[in-house]
Curated annotation (Swiss-Prot):
The keyword Amino-acid biosynthesis applies. Its EC number is 5.1.1.7. GO terms for molecular function: diaminopimelate epimerase activity. One of its GO terms (biological process) is lysine biosynthetic process via diaminopimelate. The record marks 270 as: Important for dimerization. The active site is at 75 (proton donor), 219 (proton acceptor). Its main location: cytoplasm. It comes from Pseudoalteromonas atlantica (strain T6c / ATCC BAA-1087). The lineage of its organism: Bacteria, Pseudomonadati, Pseudomonadota, Gammaproteobacteria, Alteromonadales. One of its GO terms (cellular component) is cytosol. It is found in: Cytoplasm. This is Diaminopimelate epimerase. It comes from the Bacteria. Pathway: Amino-acid biosynthesis; L-lysine biosynthesis via DAP pathway; DL-2,6-diaminopimelate from LL-2,6-diaminopimelate: step 1/1. HAMAP family: DAP_epimerase (MF_00197).
């Protein structure tokens, strides 16, 4: 069986995108892991699957699988690639696209300059909904592991995020601390670990260690999480430029009770076929 796919990326965070509207494909966890291998497969951070809508008021359903085959609820960079893919492949001609995800409903917008804006919904800070084991909601949590103490913010952007403030993202121990915290017992479902350096109140640098993936060149939901946490800690403005290793995103959030929006690029690399 031949399955068509597209290779895409958002700021270097790379994806294989599958049209499961005109095709009917199932990938096992093991098969996803094989295809994600950069030496023996196609190579990607995540597999994105476009499915028919579950609700007639929505345009599509959006599924995301990490390179280890685990299914996750949200991916901001992937959402931008999803939006470009469905229009590029003629699955829709709309500039506003409503999709459902495992985490809920999101809205995607094609901008006139070719960039894509994603309505990421409201950041969720309630510990039980992140989920995070904590007695009460705080702007800064103390997490201990062995002889180390970490001060971090926590938020869900449809997936759990832990954000640490660092002096310099270039010298931060992203690999070591990331591995320590990504599956910490305080996060029952694991968490993506963000390392944020504040340049000024409207500009940050960020690196993210993602659960099930490791460090990537960019993490859209991680950028959203960092800005939301920074605002709650009274350190950031309502509009923030986020520099990631793979490029730049613009994040806008008016504060608690309002939706957060992310704007950035989505690039098509090539199309191919998988033999199953």
């Amino acid at each position: 069986m031949q399955v068509q796919f597209s290779k895409m990326h958002g700021l270097g965070n790379d994806f294989v995108v599958i049209d499961n509207v005109t095709q009917n494909v199932f990938f096992s966890k093991e098969k996803i892991s094989q295809l994600a291998d950069r030496n023996f497969g196609i190579g990607f951070d995540q597999l994105l699957v476009v499915e028919p809508p579950y609700d007639p008021e929505q345009d599509f359903h959006y599924r995301i699988f990490n390179s280890d085959g685990s299914e996750v609820s949200q991916c901001g960079n992937g959402a931008r690639c999803f939006a470009r893919f469905v229009k590029m492949k003629g699955l829709t001609n709309r500039n506003k696209i409503v999709v459902s995800t495992k985490a809920g409903r999101i809205v995607l917008y094609h901008e006139r300059d070719g960039q894509i804006t994603v309505n990421m919904g409201e950041p969720i800070f309630e510990p039980a909904k992140i989920p995070l084991k904590a007695n009460k909601q705080e702007n800064i949590y103390i997490i201990r592991e062995n002889d180390h103490t970490f001060f971090c913010g926590a938020v869900s952007m449809g997936n759990p995020h832990c954000v640490l403030l660092v002096d310099d993202v270039e010298t931060a121990d992203v690999e070591g601390i990331g591995k320590t915290l990504v599956a910490h017992e305080r996060f029952p479902e694991g968490a993506n670990i963000g390392f944020m350096q504040i340049l000024n109140s409207g500009h940050i640098k960020l690196r993210v260690y993602e659960r099930g993936v490791g460090e990537t060149l960019a993490c859209g939901s991680g950028a959203c999480a960092a800005v939301a946490v920074g605002q709650m800690q009274k350190k950031l403005n309502k509009e923030v430029t986020v520099d990631l290793p793979g490029g730049t995103l613009k994040i806008r959030w008016q504060g608690p009770g309002s939706i957060l929006k992310m704007t950035g690029t989505a690039e098509h690399v090539f199309d191919g076929n998988i033999t199953l």
